[in-house]
């Protein structure tokens, strides 16, 4: 599961870099239970969901502000570019959420 937040200063180049980084991060366990394998190594799949709340600012008051999150037009384009790049890198099964939709997503963290 990749929860992708986009901020106002993000660029296409950064989206491409991040997609590659996500695929290359060694976050999966090997035979010795050491985090030593990447998404490529485990022939993994990806579920990518856009999430502007990752840029919530909770410093003032009791209601989060989302002023650092990119406008929907910019965020949607970078989200789609990120997804396209993950696919082009050879990840076979890439699922996506619907940009801007109110979705219920369940995650089970391991570790």
Language-model features, listed with the residues they occupy:
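Positively charged, low-complexity, intrinsically disordered RNA-binding extensions
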Residues: 66-111
